[in-house]
Amino acid sequence: MYQVNTESKGSLLSLRQGKEKTIWAVGGGKGGTGKSFVSASMAIHLASLEKDVTLIDADLGGPNLHTFLGMKDSNLDLGDFVTNKVPNLKDTVILTPFVGLKLIKGTENVLFMANMNYYKKMKLIRHIKTFDAKRVIIDIGTGASYNCIDFFLLSNPGILVVNPEPTSIENAYYFLKSCIIRILKVVTEFYGIEDLVNKIAVHIKDNSKSIYTFLNEIISHDKNSAHILFRALKRFNPCLIINNARSERDFLLGQSIVDVVKKYLVVDLNFLGAIPHDEKIHTSLKRLTPYLSTYPNSEVALSIRSIVEKLAYK
């Protein structure tokens, strides 16, 4: 089903210009949710449909996407661009075993990349936005650092991968909340209503207060500013995938999370579906054989194909 590429895996690419691009960013707020497996699998299936997909490993300091693709290490990685060893992001692109799928491998320079400064980050974001590929999928790191949040907000949409466990759900919720804080701070500064910035930060970080409650308070003081903030949040439409679902309750969990996020964070979260648990995923990883290639008709593969096609052709 997934055609193997006959070109050299290490070749660099000269990419064409001028195509409309979609960027998906896959995160989770917490490690161990399976986001890298989901990112790699989505990219493999999308490439089989569209033949022009680039996968970027932006999990700074802990790159592993190449392993999920059945590849060994390469000489070039994202750090070579960020540290100016190569002038353009496209210079770090390598071919994968899958036709239509390219990879930008993450860097293992933990200390440098995890603390990438603002100017280097903005340079990377500019290059990603102008990168010549029809579809770009970014596997971002864990946690709620500005780097993770800004890569997530760069996308259209950002995709949260969550396990049906309390800690994973809680981390995803607070990751979304951090994204909203980031959006509101940027918007207030852009529109010259900086007097709200400190109030936003103090109020929203109080876990007893919801975004909805806060915005209603703003309406009572400044309706125009509240309208600006509501409008900004309406443009933030993240998506949700439940991974490692084992029970019927796990498969139904997504809609419950959507309802809570809408009620307390005033954001429309789009539930894409659930991916069932399968021990063979770990077996495939140990053997360096991509799961979708080995088990193309499994329930996991069917779920991933459904999610990708829902996202790509909605």
Predicted regions and their residues:
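P-loop/Walker-type NTP enzyme "switch/lid" segment
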Residues: A58-K134, F190, I204-K205, R231-K234, ...
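Post-Walker A helix-loop "phosphate-sensing" segment adjacent to the P-loop in P-loop NTPases
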Residues: I44-I56, S74-N75, L184
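Hydrophobic positions on the alpha1 helix immediately C-terminal to the Walker A/P-loop
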Residues: V38
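Conserved catalytic-core segment of NTP-binding enzymes
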Residues: G141-N270
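Conserved lysine of the Walker
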Residues: K35
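C-terminal boundary of histidine-terminating zinc-finger modules
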Residues: L285-V300
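Conserved nucleotide-binding/hydrolysis micro-motifs of P-loop NTPases
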Residues: L60-G62, N109-L111, G143-A144, E165-S168, ...
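Extreme N-terminal, non-catalytic leader segments
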Residues: M1-G32, S41, H45-A47, K51, ...
